[in-house]
C-alpha cells in the first residue's frame, strides 16, 4: 500500500531501477548495445539490468499518472452520463432515413460534410441552456426572497445547467479550432497576395523607368 502511495504522490521518488544506471553498466551498454553475441557473454544479472537502458515504446492506450492525477493517453471528452450528470441538451440532430419502406433515426457524424446542421444545433442548444440558466437564476433570487432555506435544490439545478454548458462548449472546440485554422490560412493567403501585388507593382515601375533611359 505504501508503494502505491509513493508512486501516486504529487512528487514521486525516483524509480527503483535507477540503481542500475551505474558507470559500469553504462559502459557495458555502450560496448554491447543490442549486439546479441556480446550480450550472450554477459551474466544473467547484467542482461536484466541492461534492459532498463533500452528506451521503451510509447504507450498507445491506457492511462498514466502525473503530479498526483491520472491522465488518459487518448484525450477523449467523457460523456456526461459517465460522470453521473444529467444531459439537458440533444447530443446531435437526428436525421430520418427511409429504407425498405421503414424509417430509421440516424445520427450524423461531425466529420460528415452533409451534417452542417450538427454544429448549428450545438449553437442552438447552447442558447437554450443560457436562457435556462438565466431563468433558474431569477427563480433562485425569488426563492431567496421568500424562504432562503429552500435554495439548495435550485442551486443544484443551476450547477447541472452550468456543467452542461461547459461540456457543450468543449464539444464545440474541434469546430472552433478548424474555423480558427481556416481564418489563419486566409490571412496568410491575403498577406502573400498583397506581397505579390506589391512586387508586381515595383517590377512595373522598374521596367517603365528602364524604358525611359
UniProtKB/Swiss-Prot annotation:
Top-level taxon of the source organism: Eukaryota
GO cellular component: core mediator complex; mediator complex
Keyword DNA repair: no
GO molecular function, one term: transcription coregulator activity
Entries under Gene3D superfamilies matching the protein: 6.10.140.1520, 6.10.140.200
Region feature (Disordered): 96-120
Ranges annotated as biased composition (Polar residues): 97-120
Keyword ATP-binding: no
Major subcellular location class: nucleus
Keywords: Activator, Nucleus, Transcription, Transcription regulation
A biological process term (GO) from this entry: regulation of transcription by RNA polymerase II
Subcellular compartments: Nucleus
Function: Component of the Mediator complex, a coactivator involved in the regulated transcription of nearly all RNA polymerase II-dependent genes. Mediator functions as a bridge to convey information from gene-specific regulatory proteins to the basal RNA polymerase II transcription machinery. Mediator is recruited to promoters by direct interactions with regulatory proteins and serves as a scaffold for the assembly of a functional preinitiation complex with RNA polymerase II and the general transcription factors.
Similarity-based family: Belongs to the Mediator complex subunit 7 family.
Oligomeric form and interacting partners: Component of the Mediator complex.
Record protein name field: Mediator of RNA polymerase II transcription subunit 7
Organism: Kluyveromyces lactis (strain ATCC 8585 / CBS 2359 / DSM 70799 / NBRC 1267 / NRRL Y-1140 / WM37) (Yeast)
Gene: MED7
Amino acid at each position: 500500500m505504501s508503494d502505491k502511495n509513493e508512486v501516486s504522490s504529487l512528487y514521486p521518488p525516483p524509480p527503483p531501477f535507477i540503481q542500475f544506471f551505474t558507470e559500469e553498466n553504462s559502459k557495458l551498454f555502450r560496448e554491447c548495445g543490442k549486439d546479441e553475441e556480446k550480450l550472450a557473454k554477459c551474466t544473467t544479472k547484467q542482461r536484466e539490468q541492461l534492459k532498463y537502458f533500452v528506451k521503451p515504446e510509447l504507450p498507445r492506450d491506457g492511462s498514466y499518472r502525473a503530479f498526483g492525477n491520472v491522465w488518459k493517453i487518448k484525450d477523449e471528452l467523457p460523456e456526461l452520463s459517465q460522470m453521473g450528470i444529467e444531459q439537458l441538451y440533444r447530443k446531435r440532430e437526428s436525421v430520418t432515413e427511409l429504407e425498405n419502406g421503414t424509417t430509421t433515426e440516424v445520427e450524423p457524424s461531425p466529420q460528415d460534410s452533409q451534417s452542417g446542421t450538427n454544429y448549428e444545433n450545438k449553437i442552438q442548444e447552447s442558447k437554450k441552456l443560457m436562457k435556462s440558466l438565466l431563468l433558474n437564476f431569477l427563480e433562485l433570487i425569488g426563492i431567496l426572497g421568500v424562504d432562503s432555506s429552500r435554495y439548495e435544490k435550485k442551486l443544484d439545478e443551476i450547477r447541472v445547467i452550468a456543467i452542461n454548458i461547459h461540456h457543450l462548449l468543449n464539444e464545440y472546440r474541434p469546430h472552433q479550432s478548424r474555423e480558427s485554422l481556416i481564418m489563419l490560412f486566409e490571412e496568410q493567403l491575403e498577406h502573400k497576395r498583397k506581397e505579390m501585388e506589391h512586387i508586381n507593382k515595383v517590377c512595373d515601375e522598374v521596367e517603365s523607368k528602364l524604358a525611359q533611359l
